Amino acid sequence: MSRIVCKWIVLSTALLAPAASFAQVACTRDGLQAATNLYIEAQSKGDPSGMPLANGLAYIENMQVVDIKSSVIQKPLKIDFHRTLIDPATCQTFTEVIVTDKSHPYVIGTRLRINHDKIAEIESLVTQDGDWLFNVDNYYKWSPAEDWGVVPPGQRDSRDTLVAAANAYLDAFLEKKLDLVPWGYPCNRTEGGIRTGKGVPEDSCQVGVPSGVNIVARRFIVDETMGAVVAFCTFGVGGLPDTHIFRVEKGKLRFVHTLTHVPEGRQVGRGGQGRGRGPNNEK
C-alpha cells in the first residue's frame, strides 16, 4: 500500500514540477504517460516551457530538423482527441492528436524519446489540408470510436509478433504478396480521411494495397499492453514522410491508421517516390 501511495505522489509531483522529479519514473509506463501528459498540455497551450527538455533536444517535423521556436508545438491547439502508445523498452511514446478547428485542422503523430530525466527527442508527423487524403472530420468520426483498449495479459501478442505484423503489411506494398500479411476480420484502414470499411463483419484492410512502393527507413514504437505498433517510415528513399499505426489482436490486423505528409510541390502516385493510390483507388 505504501508503494502505491508513494508512486501516486511521485507522478503527481512530476506533472506539477517535471524538471524536479521526472527522473524517478521516467521510463516506467506511468512515467512515460506523465511525459505524454506534459506534451499534450504544452501543445494545448502552445508553450513547451513546462516540459523537461534536454539541452541538446532534437526537434523534428515531417522528418526535417526544425527550430522548436518556429514549430507546431508553439501554436496553441484545441485538441479534440488523442491516443497514446507507450514503449518502456525503448523509453518512447507515440501520440495521435486530432484537432478539428475549422480555421486550421490537424492530425499529428508525435514521438517522444526520454533520456533519463529529460525529453531528448520530439518528432511530429504533422498533417493538414493538402496532405494525403486529409479529412479531419472523417478521421475524428472514426478514430475515437475504435477499440484500442488494454489487451488482457493472457491475450497479449509479443513485441516480435506486433513488429512482424507491421512489417508484413508494409512489405506487401513492394511486391504485393498479400498472402503473407496477417489480415484480421473485420479490419478497417483509415488513410488521411478515407476508410476501407463499411461497418460489416467482412470489412478488410486489404482493399487498395498498391504495388511497387518501397516503404523504407522504418522505426517502430511498440505497446504490447495496447496491442499496437507504429512505424515511422518513408515512401521510397527520400520519399513522403509517413506513419502507419496498427492495432493487432491475436496476431491479426484490426485497425490501420496512415498519416502521410506531402511536401509542397511534391507529386504523388509515382512508385517508390510517391504514395500510390488510396484505399478506394483515390489519387
Say what each PLM segment does.
Residues 1-10:
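Bacterial N-terminal signal peptides that target proteins for export
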Residues 18-20:
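N-terminal signal peptide c-region/cleavage motif recognized by signal peptidases
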Residues 22-283:
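C-terminal and inter-domain tail/linker signature
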